[in-house]
Amino acid sequence: MKPVSHALIWHWGAPAVVVHQFPVRHATPQAVAEALAAGRSTEVVTGHIGLDTYIEQGGYRLLQQCHAGERSADSVIQALEGAGLRGLGGAGFPAGRKWRIVREQPAPRLLAVNADEGEPGTFKDRWLLERDPHRLLEGVFIAAWAVGVDKVFIYLRDEYPGCRALLLHELDRLQAQPPVPGLPAVELRRGAGAYVCGEESAMIESIEGRRGLPRLRPPYVAERGLFGRPTLVHNVETLFWVREIVDRGSAWFAAQGRHGRSGLRRFSVSGRVAQPGVKLAPAGITLRELIDEYCGGMQPGHELYAYLPGGASGGILPARLADVPMDFDSLQPYGCFIGSAAVIVLSQHDRAVDAARNVMRFFAHESCGQCTPCRAGTAKAVALMAQPVWHAPLLAELGQVMRDASICGLGQAAPNIVDGVLAHFAHEVAP
């Protein structure tokens, strides 16, 4: 059996090995043997900002102002709109507009937090949860107040047992010591382990107890989502920004970008850089700037060769395009998108074709099988890409069919990396 790329989500600590549910980062045979001998099976998250410390640092003050009538729901939504905050999980839909759409729907309304984080190369949401869970929760409660939400569901990746235990503990603390009366109930749901459950309608199917299959749209989840009710769906990082944007003002956030872009975002950087990890950087930063200013440059003996700007689904670009601003829409002319900002850096010791084959095997493995273009298309692409010389016209035609006819973004985005290899690394697959 050929190896399949599963996102272990410890990319910044590669090579990583998971012993039961205990991650061994920068793994060596000795370190793995020690973990086995010690019987370590679960990671315990420590060092996070707990409830008492969060309150001492001004946490939940904004939520209290909202409930006391010092802030109006419309002013909070206007702050998000003025800041230009967009969904930071992949689609990039304007957050303020989404709040208005759901708010205008008939009650009862629900909120679903997508913490599934299945895109290979992405680990920023886990990083945030392990450090400052109450900043997320305050964003959740402010959104629930502004939109009029009755109940919140947090769909958490099952490979994050430490985050789950942490959130359960902090939610118990909030129940015993609520910052405001009448907080909506929050229910944690374990992710089903499928990549496709990161798609919002598939996630909703999974929360409802069914197999995570994407829905045909319309209706959209903002109109008919969880249990048939209007549902606000947000990624962890999007909600993480709510408190700071409203506190500091939309103008502050909008002024942070580079190269004509606006805002800040967290990049999950892995690969051949000297200092991988989660990097808070201006929207629109270029890869070259990101590597030089935030990652300590490339690793010794490695030169930039290629990069994936948006994880497995975001396509691939060569080093000569390392000065393209990385933000929504700016990468589309090159057949790529930023998605969840999972930046994977390759050097001259890597081959783009190997990355592409690994990515397509991942998509073929993770296809839910509901629609033929994705189910059969990814399998056919794997077979065609296994050849030493690629049949470019056939792969291009296959990719177009997948984009046009697949139900969800998995099948629509899977051909991106194929197109990138053919456009920029044809020498690797040519006769």
Range-by-range predicted roles:
Residues 1-2, 18-36, 61-80, 107-109, ...:
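Ferredoxin-type iron-sulfur electron-transfer modules in oxidoreductases and energy-metabolism complexes
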Residues 13-18, 91-92, 96-99, 122-125, ...:
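Short acidic, glycine/serine/threonine-rich loops at helix termini
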Residues 34-82, 234-237, 241-249:
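Flexible inter-domain linker/hinge segments
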Residues 54-61, 113-125, 221-226, 268-273:
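Gly-rich Lys/Arg/Thr-decorated short loops/hinges at beta-loop-alpha junctions or inter-strand turns
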Residues 80-101, 193-205, 209, 364-376, ...:
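Conserved phosphate/anionic-ligand binding catalytic regions in large, soluble enzymes, centered on
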Residues 132-146:
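Histidine-anchored nucleotide/phosphate-binding helix
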Residues 139-143, 283-300:
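Short amphipathic, charge-patterned alpha-helical segments
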Residues 164-283, 295:
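Hydrophobic alpha-helical positions that pack around
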